[in-house]
């Protein structure tokens, strides 16, 4: 299952690409540019979340996190109470 924050960030990035380069296969264009964050953001995601960024035209967009199932939030900072039993 893909984290909602990741989906929202990808959709936002796709809107930017569509506005600037409408003739490209936007989905694949974005997916190919997702990279792990560099060391500057090694502690950006909390609770063992994984930090990613999208590089468009040699510019990295804001980092975003893929959270473990028990955490949510833009930086995985909240406990997902729905998954706690």
UniProtKB/Swiss-Prot annotation:
One annotated GO molecular function is: growth factor activity
The residues that carry sugar chains are 48, 58
Ranges for domain EGF-like = 33-77
Gene Ontology CC terms, in alphabetical order: extracellular region
The domain of life is Viruses
Q: What are the boundaries of the signal sequence?
A: 1-19
Q: What is its main location?
A: secreted
Q: Where in the cell is it found?
A: Secreted
Main role?
A: Stimulates the growth of some tissues.
What's this protein's name?
Growth factor
Organism from which the protein derives = Myxoma virus (strain Lausanne) (MYXV)
Gene assigned in the entry:
MGF
């Amino acid at each position: 299952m893909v984290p909602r924050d990741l989906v929202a960030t990808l959709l936002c990035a796709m809107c930017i690409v569509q506005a600037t380069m409408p003739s490209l296969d936007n989905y694949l264009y974005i997916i190919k540019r997702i990279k792990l964050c560099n060391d500057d953001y090694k502690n950006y995601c909390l609770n063992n979340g994984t930090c990613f960024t999208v590089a468009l035209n040699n510019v990295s967009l804001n980092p975003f996190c893929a959270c473990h199932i028990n955490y949510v939030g833009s930086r995985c900072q909240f406990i997902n109470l729905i998954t706690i039993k």
